[in-house]
């Protein structure tokens, strides 16, 4: 059954994007014309729907607590732990609206997905290239400065250790919050890895818990940890 769910996940993942290709093109034309309202309307409708569909076909239930802690009057930087491929659709489905993500460059090579991610405001980073990483962080900073929230995985890659653990946080990711003065919203994803990677990359039903907290770190306080 887990094999069938995994196959269904990939069929749905790309099938949705193929079936809605016309909508993707409409959003891209709107972006080229500077019609940000249309782009936002399309992104806010389809990306959460696509993400929820991935969870549904794989039998994953999402339990989110603390959405009331997200600031409503200003952009923020969501800081999430990273343990599973599920993490991105979980955040896109679970937060109050989808936000751009600091994502690894490999995702930019996936057809259709890369175009939706660019519309969302994702920034792709070459983790082994210092200059490219700095440019990516500057691009992400500009997005927050424009009034849009952003998601970062400060570990820089998926942590493969025991549940509840975390990898080493990369200081550079926090500079987005430092430079913009945006509040940091920690997001803890629990249980995702056990439903896929720990099962030999086979989709397994279960529940993922995502508590959302809030902290407003002032720039000089954050710099002490960089």
Spans of features found by a protein language model:
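Short, basic, glycine/proline-bearing loop/turn elements
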Residues: 51, 122-126, 157-158
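Conserved small/polar residues in nucleotide/adenosyl-binding loops
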Residues: 215-224
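Catalytic core of membrane glycerolipid acyltransferases/transacylases, capturing the structured
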Residues: 20-33, 40-44, 56-58, 72-130
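Membrane-interfacial terminal anchoring regions of lipid-handling membrane enzymes
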Residues: 1-33, 37-41, 45, 62-72, ...
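Hydrophobic residues at beta-strand termini and immediately following loops
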Residues: 125, 187, 212
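Acyl/amide activation-and-transfer machinery of modular secondary-metabolite enzymes
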Residues: 207-214
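Membrane-associated lipid acylation/remodeling enzymes share a hydrophobic transmembrane-juxtamembrane segment
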Residues: 130, 134-202, 209
């Amino acid at each position: 059954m887990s094999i069938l769910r995994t196959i269904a996940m990939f069929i749905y993942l790309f099938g949705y994007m193929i079936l809605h290709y016309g909508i993707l093109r409409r959003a891209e034309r709107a972006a080229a014309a500077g019609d940000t309202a249309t782009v936002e309307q399309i992104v806010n409708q389809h990306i959460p729907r696509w993400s929820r569909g991935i969870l549904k076909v794989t039998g994953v239930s999402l339990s989110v607590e603390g959405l009331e802690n997200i600031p409503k009057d200003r952009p923020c930087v969501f800081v999430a732990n990273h343990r599973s491929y599920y993490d991105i659709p979980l955040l896109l489905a679970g937060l109050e609206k989808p936000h751009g993500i600091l994502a690894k460059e490999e995702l930019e090579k996936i057809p259709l997905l890369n175009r939706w991610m660019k519309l969302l405001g994702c920034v792709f980073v070459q983790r082994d290239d210092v200059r490219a990483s700095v440019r990516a962080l500057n691009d992400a900073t500009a997005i927050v400065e424009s009034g849009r929230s952003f998601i970062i995985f400060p570990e820089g890659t998926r942590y493969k250790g025991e549940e509840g653990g975390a990898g080493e946080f990369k200081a550079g990711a926090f500079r987005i919050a430092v430079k913009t003065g945006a509040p940091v919203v920690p997001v803890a994803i629990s249980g995702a890895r056990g439903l896929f990677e720990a099962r030999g990359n086979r989709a397994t039903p279960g529940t993922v818990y995502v508590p959302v907290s809030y902290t407003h770190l002032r720039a000089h306080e954050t710099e002490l940890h960089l």
